[in-house]
Every structure is written in structure tokens, then in C-alpha cells.
Amino acid sequence: MESADLRDPDGMPVTLSDFEIDAAGRLSADLLAYLEGGAEAGQSVTENRAAFGRIGLLPKLLSPCAGGHTRTTILGKQAPHPIMVAPMAFQNLFHPQGESATAMAAAAQDATMVLSCQTSTPPEDIATIPGRRWFQLYMQADHEATMALVTRAVDCGADALVVTLDAPINGLRDREVAAGFTLPDDVRPVMLDVLPQPPRPHLRDGQSVVFDGMMVFAPTADDLARLIADSPVPVIVKGCLRPADATRLIDLGAQGIIVSNHGGRVLDTVPAPITQLAAVVDAVAGAVPVYVDGGIRRGSDVFKALALGAQAVLVGRPVMHGLIVDGPRGASQVLRRLRDELEVTMALCGCATVADITPDLLTGFSGTGS
């Protein structure tokens, strides 16, 4: 993390790292651990950012950029820029208006917001706020319960589903445990709380709580195919790191792939998504759009992701930092700062449009390709 803690003349943080520093000073130890912590030792959280730093920029000269722009296409619709708001649970932990405040910020910057399945604000309330939204979905043990979530989300304006597959169970978050984080009684997953809960398996002596208990309800390929067939809106799958998984997901009907490691919050020592992006893009071969999240803190990071084949990027924790510091205005400033930095990076690298951002403008990059 950059640590200058810069302020503008009005006393507001300047960069995304400055927002992060300010936000940390406003949170209790347990809330800070929940927001910033990762799985186990948190190596993947650190690596998500560090991986961008190992990729350099190689600008080209004498490229006309007058009249340039950041416009792109996201699921067939024109977007003014390729920056989206990632799904984040329980935003009422960080602002009284929770997800509604984030929706206001996203709308102010014309950014698509992905609403979490674990939203602490009813989607009906968020639907009153203008803007484009997708809905992040954890598939339920019962298909009817899953479709009830889908129907409610679509009725509230979601025009795509983001099915998260990399967290069939929770990871081990040591930092949260040490800080004593528990969800307060007045912050609940309001969409999940109203669903019937499946009976828990009765475990015999010697059976595993994980394998014989929790994983009994994990989604299968057949479950995903059925959801895709029944969904009234496109289904994008989040949590893919392996090229072979990407091609299999497309075979099952996925209409987009998000390369992600869940912000390093589920399994530690998995690779940073940016290091896997090019290999996944190559495997997909243009069949569906590919998106990426994880560790993006600068407009130059957005540029690097686009150069490696991402259609757009998703940003999570920085939006919460902005929300903590100054509500919807702060979150909006975070998104605007990223876009401004992207424009400057494009101009200085000789790119008038996002279509001009190509891999030859990067140096020092080596993906795993596995």
C-alpha cells in the first residue's frame, strides 16, 4: 500500500491508497479486519496488488490521441468507461445507507454496480436509484430457492447474474477471528434470510464437517447448467483462475467470465488474477467477454488489465474506503479518480481508445499460462 496519505486543499484524500489510510483510521479493529483481511496469512491479498507492480508500461510515441475516450461495450451496451463496482456483502457495516449509498456513487459515475447476494439493503430500495446493476448470486441447495433470488433481483432491475463459484464454503480468515469480528444483529443478508434453509446433514462419528456437511450443498456443473437455462438474463461466472475451467464454463452456457480470487478472502496462496488473465483470455478465444478483479488501485492497473484482454475491471475494497470516508461522494470520487488516471495513462501510452490498449504496451509481464 502506498503510504503518503496525501490530501487536497479541502482535506480530502487524493489517491485510492490515501482513501484506504483514512478509512482505516475510522474503523474499529474488528471491522477493519473484516474489510481488509484475507484467508489465512493473507498472502494472496498482498500478491493481488504486488502483481500489478511487476508489470511495466512501454509507451509508444507520436500517436494522435485528441478526441480520445474510455468508452467500451459491456454485455452489448455502451459504457462510458470499463470500471465496475464489485459485489461486496453487508455494506451497512460501513455506512448507514449501505448498498444504496454505493448505488448512488456508481450512478454518479455511470458505473455498473454488482449487488451482492448478501446485501444488507433490500434490492427494492436500491431499485429506486438510477443506474445499471448486475446481481451476484450464490447458488442455493434448492433450485427453487435460487430462482426465487434470481426473480427478485431481475424484478429489481438486474440485467445480468454473476454466479460466484470459488466459495462453496467460507475460507479461514485468521485476522477476523483474532479481532473477534461477528456480524451485528442489525446487519443481515436480507435476501437470504427470507429463504427456507435446507436441513443440516446429521453427521455420524468420524464424518467430516467439511466434506460430509458443508460440501453436500456445493453447486455442481448440472446445477449451473440448469440455472443458465432458466435464467431470464445473461449469466457470468466469477472466480475462474484456470483456462480449462473457463472453456468448460462456456460449454455449460456461461456468457462471461470474471477472473478472480475473491479478493484473497477464500483461499490463500492462489495466484493474483492479473497473472492468470492472459491465459484465460487466450483459452476463451473471444467466445465470451472476460473481466478481472483483485488488487486494482490505479488507473494504470486498469490499463494493464485491458492490455491483457479484460473487457472491464471490477473494484471492491476501494469503493468501500470512499464510502467510509465521505459516503456516496467519497465512493464516487474513488471511481472518478480511477477513470481520470486511466485517461492519463492512455494518453501517455499513445492510446486514444480502449481498443488501442494492446499487450505490446506492457513490459515485464509473465503469466502462468496454466
UniProtKB/Swiss-Prot annotation:
Catalyzes the oxidation of (S)-lactate (L-lactate) to pyruvate, with a reduction of O2 to H2O2. Is also able to use glycolate and to a lesser extent 2-hydroxyoctadecanoate as substrate. Its EC number is 1.1.3.-, 1.1.3.15. Keywords: Flavoprotein, FMN, Oxidoreductase. It catalyses: (S)-lactate + O2 = pyruvate + H2O2; a (2S)-2-hydroxycarboxylate + O2 = a 2-oxocarboxylate + H2O2; glycolate + O2 = glyoxylate + H2O2; 2-hydroxyoctadecanoate + O2 = 2-oxooctadecanoate + H2O2. This is L-lactate oxidase. One of its GO terms (molecular function) is (S)-2-hydroxy-acid oxidase activity. Gene3D superfamilies: Aldolase class I (3.20.20.70). CDD domains: alpha_hydroxyacid_oxid_FMN (cd02809). The lineage of its organism: Bacteria, Pseudomonadati, Pseudomonadota, Alphaproteobacteria, Rhodobacterales. Residues 8-367 form the FMN hydroxy acid dehydrogenase domain. The keyword Oxidoreductase applies. It comes from Roseobacter sp. (strain GAI101). Belongs to the FMN-dependent alpha-hydroxy acid dehydrogenase family. The active site is at H262. It is an enzyme of class 1 (oxidoreductase). Disulfide bonds: none annotated. Pyruvate binds at Y34, Y138, R173, H262, R265. FMN binds at P87, M88, A89, S116, Q136, T164, K238, S260, D293, G294, G295, I296, R297, R317. Homotetramer.
